[in-house]
Amino acid sequence: MSSIIRINNIYTSPVIRWIIADESLWKDSNYETLLLYKKGNFQSQFNQKSIYYSESRKLKEGQFYLSLFHFEDTNLQKSATSASEGGITTNGMRSFYYQYLVDESVNGYQLVKKIEIPDITTNDCMAMPYGGNVIISIGALKEFREYNSKGEIMSKYYMNDTNFSNPIFKYTMGRYWF
């Protein structure tokens, strides 16, 4: 499991404002009261490496989006059942694009978009929204992809002559002059 931590006044007097995480990680700790309320039934983020922050004019004050890559370990969900039934668990990692709507006015967050991204087993990924689509950058595979809102791949690109790729972003280039 992972935690997303917002820190205010980071350069002067750092103060933790809130935490997004599975409740079990912070249970009975001094930080438990800083957890944002999770609206809905979904597995909190796991093993993410990067987060993309975005705003929208459609949102109210105090609301914003966090986009991230999430690795869902189905063994976490099955292990208790399998162990009690004497079953054998398989390595069940599945990867998803997650988009949270964070609402600081009510100290809560909810999962507003979840798209399964097949055949990615490395956690070296970055995800960002682009219109209704999603841009996925996979450093270890030296590729980036664009998916539509249904999770269908629209394009896939590879980079040659490099050991590793940096995160890839896509922007409209509006307001730029050439």
What are these regions (language model features)?
Residues 1-178:
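Histidine-/acidic-rich catalytic cores in large beta-rich domains
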